[in-house]
Amino acid sequence: MSDDPLQTPRARQGRAPDVFRPGGWVPMRCHRDDEPVDFVIVGTGAGGGTLACKLAEYGFSVVALDAGPYFRPLEDFASDEAEQTKLYWTDDRLVDGANPLQLGSNNSGKAVGGSTVHFAMVSLRFRPEWFKSRTLLGYGADWPLDWREMWTYYTEVEQALKISGPITYPWGPKRPRYPYRAHPLNAAARVLARGCEALGISWTETPLATLSAPRGLAHPCVYRGFCVAGCSTNAKQSALVTWIPRALAAGAEIRDLAMAGRIEVDSDGLVSGVHYHREGGWHFQRARNVVVAGYAIETPRLLLSSATDRYRDGLANSSGLVGKNLMTQSNQAVWGVMDDEIRSYKGPPSLAITEHWNYQDWDKDFFGGYAYMSQGPLPQLWANTQAQARGLWGAPLVGEMTSYNHVAGLKIVGEMLPQERNRVTLADEVDQYGLRIPRVTYSWCDNDKRLIDHALGFMHRALQAAGAKDIWVQEDDTCHLNGTARMGDDPRTSVVDADCRSWDIPNLWICDGSVFPTVGGVNPSLTIQAIACRTADRIRAVARRGELTRRRGAQTKVATHAT
């Protein structure tokens, strides 16, 4: 049998790949399809992988499905940008709107571990006021969560991932020291530092989910620079090498190359399992609860694709909001040429950061905020950027690439506002499984444009103050995907409650970036994992009361077990 992870499932017959030992295996509990498990989880990234771990450790029986392959980082990942495109979700999707999104490498992964397998490891907490941005800051929507409670879950995730970060963090409430020391700054990070200091604002080392010291069988970062193309040393603390091994050890089953197609609903209106495609055919895994954690495009796609006579608009969609309020984050950049060699690709791509404009609410003409970080693009990505953003080709492109080692850049992660017109719907076209593909509609609002203009102007000044020449701006880029199944405290204006539980179907849960009411000006992965940890705790509490599949306001209780 072929061991090509793109063609043949690896997690099967009672074993799964050992991500820490080449060619090694670890035991894995397996369930029959007709054996109802406590939870089927669709997706194994920051939301699903974390939740699978926590629920299994709490004693629930868990089967986690992922459409992507089960990679062995030590063997499958190479210092080859073209080869590593296998990490990205590149299935057909339609895009439209005034600002159609470029989907793939910058915002969605397809692998056990989800997008964390190729993420840039930036691990930041939300500003506390963002959880009540409508009430406190006058825009967006309030979260049904308290920042103080989230602070405890942030700490749990930072410890679980051994985040490497500064001794003190300049913004927000006091927090514990990061578990591991910060990574040393490369030359690109020092350019950011010089620019910030020249303009009188604070900066610091970026908190990163990559090891600065050994951890068990995982080696510290060797600064090879291919972080977003897959870490071949296991220094990157993705879900694949953190939560998933813990989930397996606790008794969870992982099924790779398992594409979920439809959630089944029984005669009582409860979900009863998931239809999925694996090894050439369709299967049905029975479950007492279903969690959708496919990220902000695949999650609404699955919910909408599971419409029934009872739920004609799709599952969990009595509010009509499934698929709506899609939010990306602005990811524009400013680039310049320095006299000294920078070699910005040496080390993780974002070693220094400022959150100044996330925490300052005056002297700006937009709502929300943004962080900006140093950048370290790899050669192929840099050539593609030159061709796409500046139209360079042939001799001009070759000439530009000769200055590659002298280039420094600053790039934002900026907050884009929720808008119902930005949405995921189902197209008429179908994919290789016969499933309708998603149509993704996206347009910037005026506030988004003002934020981008402000950020580009400020970063231009910062780069100029740091000594850059030949400065140019990259005006059209986005990152991350959130929204489309927002949480809230009112079933008329949200899809799930604060516990990520569907208002409509009590044994259907959503646990990923889809539940974000707003997106903030920081990378979302730490918040997604914190929400997953909280959701696991809430599920355990509900189970202990015997209310795991009880309809809201009903008297009957269907209990399941938990330690």
Predicted regions and their residues:
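Short, glycine/acidic-rich hinge or "gate" loops at secondary-structure transitions
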Residues: P73-L74, G165-P176, I471-D477, R545-A554
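Conserved redox-cofactor binding core of oxidoreductases
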Residues: D3-P17, T135-A260, H480
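A glycine-rich dinucleotide-binding beta-alpha-beta segment and adjacent secondary-structure elements
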Residues: P36, E205-S212, G216, P220-A229, ...
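Flavin (FAD/FMN)-binding glycine-rich loop and adjacent Rossmann-like elements that form
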Residues: A120-L124, A189, W203, T210, ...
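N-terminal glycine-rich phosphate/pyrophosphate-binding loop and immediately adjacent elements
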Residues: T8-T155, Y276, E298, L315-M338, ...
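Glycine-rich loop(s) and the adjacent beta-strand/alpha-helix scaffold that form part
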Residues: E57, S61, G68-A78, T233, ...
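Mid-to-C-terminal "cap/lid" subdomains and adjacent gly/pro-rich loops that border
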Residues: E253, N289-A408, I412-G414, A543-T563
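A conserved FAD-binding loop/helix module that cradles the flavin
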Residues: T518-D537
